[in-house]
């Protein structure tokens, strides 16, 4: 019996929410281990649509424990708003089924303001963030000046910690010509949050260690994708945390041995939000067709996603950096009806063929994709629940992806609905 880590194998938006929700039926505990409320999930269950950003997808399953780990950056207001919204849809959420690491870093309004200011300062240097304060909050965490959830339980020492935080931020704001922040305003806001948030606080590493020793099944839910990893992604156009599978251990407070099976998520094509290199992007009618069919708009931001063909080089790289054991391929149905489908099998850089994506920003901008053209299929794959429901050519496409990325397909998703999933290998039983 393996614990399972679910990570994106592209630039995020691969459909992790649905797959995690589908797998969570077999799990006892679902853990978010990095990121913040910048990465949204849309789940369709029995015709009802649920939108999650910060909460683990396990909250939609009764009888499951959901956990927000220490690797997450936590916006108090966004958390309370999301809980309230889901409760209004009939989802039961309380400290009985949701726990938050006491040492999680808090996102404050000053983080959101700084994030937006940086993005607006110059279009030439914009990264394309969601302006939700994720990056600045991680900066304060690394700078050892962050306010953490546990700090709200000690109002005697909280003013000192706020002063330490503002010593940095007010100096920065002076340089930017911004109004100084009064620590009393932050103290007042956090004091009001304390009774609403502290009931969820938990020593998560200890809780998970106890549950692991009891033999409970754990599902670790990543946000974004491996290509947005701050170390292994398309730097600097990345997120501010590690998104690879190894972060599941660090971001939850467990040792690496607690991680068993790594399931990577990828679409049958490729999308990206914001700035950065995208070798297979189709800024043409093909890209628009994929985007319209796939409803490629951000769950949280509504921003249209850039669309292109499947890039086997990048997914193969994610398989290696994440140690992926099996892939869940999503949105195969979006490619129904295409006469031909291109798949990137390699790159050409300065006239030479290469089999990996270079780390240098300049080289990334110069790579040219090498395509293999595959015959499409006319019969629908939407709502298929077994291999027998798939057209032969669609199966050939899936098998070719397996060959190119060097990893088997464990799951296949053919619609946003929870049950429209073809199981090849159960990650919990691998």
Swiss-Prot record:
Q: Which GO terms describe its cellular component?
A: cytoplasm
Q: Where is this region: Disordered?
A: 277-298
Where in this chain does the entry annotate a coiled-coil region?
Answer: none
Cite the cofactor comment: Binds 1 Mg(2+) ion per subunit.
Q: What's the domain of life for this entry?
A: Bacteria
Cross-referenced InterPro entries: Adenylosuccin_syn_GTP-bd, Adenylosuccin_syn_Lys_AS, Adenylosuccinate_synth_dom1, Adenylosuccinate_synth_dom2, Adenylosuccinate_synth_dom3, Adenylosuccinate_synthetase, P-loop_NTPase
Residues at which GTP binds: 12-18, 40-42, 305, 331-333, 413-415
Per the record, the GO terms for biological process are: 'de novo' AMP biosynthetic process; IMP metabolic process
Spell out the reaction equation it catalyses. IMP + L-aspartate + GTP = N(6)-(1,2-dicarboxyethyl)-AMP + GDP + phosphate + 2 H(+)
Q: Which residues form the active site?
A: 13 (proton acceptor), 41 (proton donor)
Q: In which pathway does it act?
A: Purine metabolism; AMP biosynthesis via de novo pathway; AMP from IMP: step 1/2
**According to the UniProt entry, which residue ranges have a biased composition of type Basic and acidic residues?**
285-296
Q: Which UniProt keywords apply?
A: Cytoplasm, GTP-binding, Ligase, Magnesium, Metal-binding, Nucleotide-binding, Purine biosynthesis
Q: Where is this gene product found?
A: Cytoplasm
What top-level class of enzyme does the UniProt entry assign? Answer: ligase
Chain residues that bind Mg(2+) = 13, 40
Q: Which family does it belong to?
A: Belongs to the adenylosuccinate synthetase family.
Which HAMAP family does the UniProt record give?
A: Adenylosucc_synth (MF_00011)
User: How does the annotation summarize its subunit structure?
Assistant: Homodimer.
Report what the protein is called: Adenylosuccinate synthetase
Organism encoding this protein: Bradyrhizobium sp. (strain BTAi1 / ATCC BAA-1182)
Q: What is the lineage of its organism?
A: Bacteria, Pseudomonadati, Pseudomonadota, Alphaproteobacteria, Hyphomicrobiales
What is the primary gene name for this protein?
A: purA
């Amino acid at each position: 019996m393996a614990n399972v880590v679910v990570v994106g194998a592209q630039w995020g938006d691969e459909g992790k929410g649905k797959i995690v929700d589908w797998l969570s039926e077999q799990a006892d505990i679902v853990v978010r281990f990095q990121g913040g409320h910048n990465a949204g999930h849309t789940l369709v269950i029995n015709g009802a649509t649920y939108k999650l950003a910060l909460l683990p997808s396990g909250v939609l399953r009764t009888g499951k424990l959901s956990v927000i780990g220490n690797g997450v950056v936590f916006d108090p207001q966004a958390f309370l708003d999301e809980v309230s919204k889901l409760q209004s849809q009939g989802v039961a959420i309380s400290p009985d089924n949701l726990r938050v690491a006491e040492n999680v870093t808090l996102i404050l309004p000053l983080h959101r303001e700084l994030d937006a200011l940086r993005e607006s300062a110059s279009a030439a240097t914009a990264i394309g963030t969601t302006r939700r304060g994720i990056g600045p909050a991680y900066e304060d965490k690394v700078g050892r000046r962050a306010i953490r959830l546990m700090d709200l339980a000690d109002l005697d020492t909280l003013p000192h910690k706020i002063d330490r935080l503002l010593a940095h931020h007010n100096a920065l704001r002076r340089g930017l010509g911004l109004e100084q922040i009064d620590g009393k305003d932050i103290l007042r806001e956090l004091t009001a949050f304390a009774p609403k948030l502290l009931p969820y606080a938990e020593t998560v590493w200890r809780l998970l260690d106890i549950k692991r020793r009891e033999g409970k099944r754990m599902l670790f839910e990543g946000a974004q994708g491996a290509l947005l990893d701050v170390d292994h992604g398309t730097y600097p156009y990345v997120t501010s945390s590690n998104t690879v599978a190894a972060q599941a251990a660090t971001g939850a407070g467990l040792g690496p041995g607690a991680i068993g099976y790594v399931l990577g998520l990828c679409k049958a094509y490729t999308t990206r939000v914001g700035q950065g290199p995208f070798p297979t992007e189709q800024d043409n009618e093909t890209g628009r067709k994929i985007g319209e069919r796939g409803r490629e708009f951000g769950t949280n931001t509504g921003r249209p996603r850039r669309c292109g063909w499947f890039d086997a080089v990048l997914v193969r790289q994610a398989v290696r950096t994440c140690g992926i054991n099996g892939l869940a391929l999503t949105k195969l149905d979006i490619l129904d009806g295409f006469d031909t489908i291109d798949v990137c099998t390699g790159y050409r850089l300065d006239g030479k063929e290469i089999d990996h994506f270079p780390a240098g920003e300049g080289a990334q901008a110069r790579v040219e994709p090498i395509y293999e053209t595959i015959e499409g299929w006319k019969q629908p794959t939407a709502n298929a629940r077994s291999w027998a429901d798939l057209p032969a050519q669609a199966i050939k496409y899936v098998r070719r992806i397996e060959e190119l990325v060097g990893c088997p397909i464990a799951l296949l998703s053919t619609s946003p609905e929870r049950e429209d999933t073809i199981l090849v290998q159960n990650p919990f039983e691998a």
